[in-house]
Amino acid sequence: MSLRRILVLILPLLGFTGMVHAGERPAAIGAYVEALSKVEQASQPLSLEPLMAAALAAQDALMEIQGLGDQAWIERLDEAGYQKLQADLRGFRLSRGYDIYAQPDPAFLDALAQQHGLAADRDFFRLYRRYWNEDLLPAYLSIGKRPTPCVRFGEGVLQDQYAGWSEYVRLYPESYQGFTRQTLADLEEAVGLGVCTCTDAASVQRELGSFVERFPNSPVAAKVRSRLVELKETPDLRPVLCR
């Protein structure tokens, strides 16, 4: 399942190329800070799409790994530089402990959009905030005590997310296209595969059956129906639990 936007990495310390000092920041970080300042200083509502694009570019720069076994840029930053980065990079949640990540802060961006954004921005970031859970995983996933995330089949979360993003694309087809299309594709992949459940096969069957009733014309509906048949006739072909 593609979770590119999460960028929560658990990186083994296989290599070390030396500390990066505070003044050696990637250009994308400065561009994000400038984009954020422009939004916060705006006297009239404006689109937050440039800010979102800048945030994703900064995220990529913070998590960039230059070579095999190397560390992410944020890991290589010296302690003074890291502390300054945390102070300067408002709107991001950063970690370089056991979990290494740099994630745009959903609550911060939602509040910003409600104050400064257009209707498309306000609606987008309301959904965006609900999309992430406390672990900065998509809400339809759970990590628990597992080494990898599982899918919360049977709880209705998948369908609620799918309905919300589908409606957003219907209302604002030109807005935030990269994120919305990828999010819908990820949700469709989850229901189409019907594996890696957090619970049991019955929860998968309930979720998939309800999904095709609620979204009979979804691009993934045929695949979901096939998976339901497979679960009934050959359940061991693709077990619902991931190890």
Feature names for model-found ranges:
Residues 22-243:
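Acidic, polar-rich low-complexity tracts and alpha-helical solenoid repeat scaffolds
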Residues 2, 18-20:
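Position-driven detector of the extreme protein N-terminus
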Residues 1-8:
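Bacterial N-terminal signal peptides that target proteins for export
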